[in-house]
Amino acid sequence: MKISQLAQLTQASTCPRLVVKVGSALLVGKDGEPRREWLSALVSEIAAMRAAGQEVIVVSSGAIALGARKLGLAKGGRGSLSDAQAAASVGQIALAGLWAELLAQHGLTAAQILLTLEDLEDRRRYLNVTATLGTLLAACAVPVINENDSVATQEIRFGDNDRLAARVGQAAGASGVLLLSDIDGLYDRDPRQPGATRIPVVKGVTPEIHAMATGGSSSGLGSGGMTSKLQAAEIAELAGMALAIIDGQPVAPIAAAMGAARGTLFLPRGRKQARKAWLGGRMRMRGSVQVDAGAAAALARGSSLLAAGVTEVDGDFQRGDAIAVLGPDGRTLARGLSEYDAAECARLKGRHSREHEELLGYAPRSALIHRDQMVLL
């Protein structure tokens, strides 16, 4: 059953597996100490959901904020990358211990997983994450996941846990993702402006929806804002998952949001094949090719991408790398795994397939990107 209402996210029958993301500003107070009473109430909610047959995965921020206080670092540990890495090293121990302690009070076992962007961009490592999550959930454990900030560099960082939550949900085969935020959903303009209206349901993250995003995290403790939440919603949408943004500030925030039906629900598309869902959720492209109108129309009909329709090649990518396919207007039409490296694509662009063997010096492949290795956006 496809999720169409906010309350269905907390029902095992409609959402048998749910990812709950908790931000730094909710978990850690301005004094740098964990908000134990608030977190204890949230854990009670998670325990009740688990008892009702719903599997729950937690994506928890807070390690940097917790570690920064212990180390006496300014700016919440975010003054520099090295500060953030050091703070995370200390804070991860405290964060994992806190979750383990509170979950144990309900007879639940916490399992810590630390991930970097590369863990979910590389297909083999992604499948390993999928297998680990499946085993933990089958054993009735509650996975508690965070970005591995102690080793992640700018190049291999998610940068926020909103998108990490969506990618984890995709890897776990979850039906929904619940983002606990410091705001109760997406508004049609800056919610501080008079007349701002919350949007209860979004069907498709369009450019108009993106235009409604405002600013970053207001607390200074986290790294995510509405823009990152919309990017997470796009990942979820492509993977066939529902995603909701709710106000995480009340005690027992999930019950409060569901009882009042207050939040923004992003509706899912239909489920994709696992490989295409992984590809659609990838956040880093190695390059791009631009195509003409004829090729764009052929892609829309479900065809593979042929080199004859390519007009431009950009980036330094290898065969098998993920690249974006841009339309004549520069808009991203698809993502796919290239059958050629960038230099070969540049030689083949605009040329008919009968010319390819002479240009390459070997028997060509059937397409520049095969339709089975491509997802339309």
Curated annotation (Swiss-Prot):
Gene3D superfamilies per UniProt: Acetylglutamate kinase-like, PUA domain
Ranges of residues in domain PUA: 286-363
Native source organism of the sequence: Novosphingobium aromaticivorans (strain ATCC 700278 / DSM 12444 / CCUG 56034 / CIP 105152 / NBRC 16084 / F199)
Gene name tied to this protein: proB
Pfam families on file: AA_kinase, PUA
Enzymatic reactions: L-glutamate + ATP = L-glutamyl 5-phosphate + ADP
UniProt-annotated binding residues for substrate: S61, D149, N161
Main location, first listed in the record: cytoplasm
Protein name in the entry: Glutamate 5-kinase
Enzyme class: transferase
Subcellular compartments: Cytoplasm
Keywords: Amino-acid biosynthesis, ATP-binding, Cytoplasm, Kinase, Nucleotide-binding, Proline biosynthesis, Transferase
PANTHER family reported for this sequence: GLUTAMATE 5-KINASE, ISOPENTENYL PHOSPHATE KINASE
Keyword field contains Transcription: no
NCBIfam families: proB (TIGR01027)
